[in-house]
Amino acid sequence: MKLGVNIDHVATLRNARGTSYPDPLKAAEIAIDAGADFITVHLREDRRHIRDEDVFNLKKSISTELNLEIAATEEMLEIAKKVKPYSISIVPEKREELTTEGGLDIVNMHSKLSSIIEEMHSSSIKVSLFIDPNIDQLKYLEKLGTKPDIIEIHTGDYCDNPSEKKLQLITNAAEYVNKLGIECHAGHGITYKHAKKMTRIPHISALNIGHYLISEAVFYGLHSVVKTMKMTMSN
């Protein structure tokens, strides 16, 4: 199973004092050296952490794939076409939220998402959609004219209040995505404890983890924390 390390909150720390450090690029390089399979960043509309120049620097400099999380806006799609990351992940976004609060509403967005997927594919960019583990939402993937390359299942509800029922919803969602012939990832709120559970779910091929890793890195160092997470996922 692959590990995608989200380095947004390295930029949060930098921006808190308006300094040039800590550098997200350096964090990405350390994470990759420790075993990260790809790097994820979320370029939010308000630029509260990652900035445009961070994204361009990462694309130019890192040795692994770059996954760019963005809202489904024209501004962000144009930036994606200029950066040309390995993949983009379309996420819902509200300015007042502290973090992404849920998955996309595929039911009401399937027409718009179809055109976005086609547009990105024409620029050789893979597309991931961030979706709750809700089969009623996932069924609408079949209405998309062009399939996304990846579905990332939102694990926040499970990670905030774990239960076997919620874990089963994620398992069922991953199985459904696999039957559609789409790669399945998972992310949001994952810790070491949750990662152990996620690795037992068939069909999930990657985890995206950010806030927890950066938080643990304050005490134990980023290299050590990423390495430990990779070992946790391997075991």
Curated annotation (Swiss-Prot):
One of its GO terms (cellular component) is cytosol. Pathway: Cofactor biosynthesis; pyridoxine 5'-phosphate biosynthesis; pyridoxine 5'-phosphate from D-erythrose 4-phosphate: step 5/5. One of its GO terms (molecular function) is pyridoxine 5'-phosphate synthase activity. Keywords: Cytoplasm, Pyridoxine biosynthesis, Transferase. 1-deoxy-D-xylulose 5-phosphate binds at D8, H9, R44, H49, T99. Signal peptide: none annotated. It is found in: Cytoplasm. The active site is at H42 (proton acceptor), E69 (proton acceptor), H188 (proton donor). Pfam families: PdxJ. 3-amino-2-oxopropyl phosphate binds at N6, R17, G189, G210, H211. One of its GO terms (biological process) is pyridoxine biosynthetic process. Catalyzes the complicated ring closure reaction between the two acyclic compounds 1-deoxy-D-xylulose-5-phosphate (DXP) and 3-amino-2-oxopropyl phosphate (1-amino-acetone-3-phosphate or AAP) to form pyridoxine 5'-phosphate (PNP) and inorganic phosphate. Belongs to the PNP synthase family. Homooctamer; tetramer of dimers. This is Pyridoxine 5'-phosphate synthase. It comes from Wolbachia pipientis wMel. The gene is pdxJ.
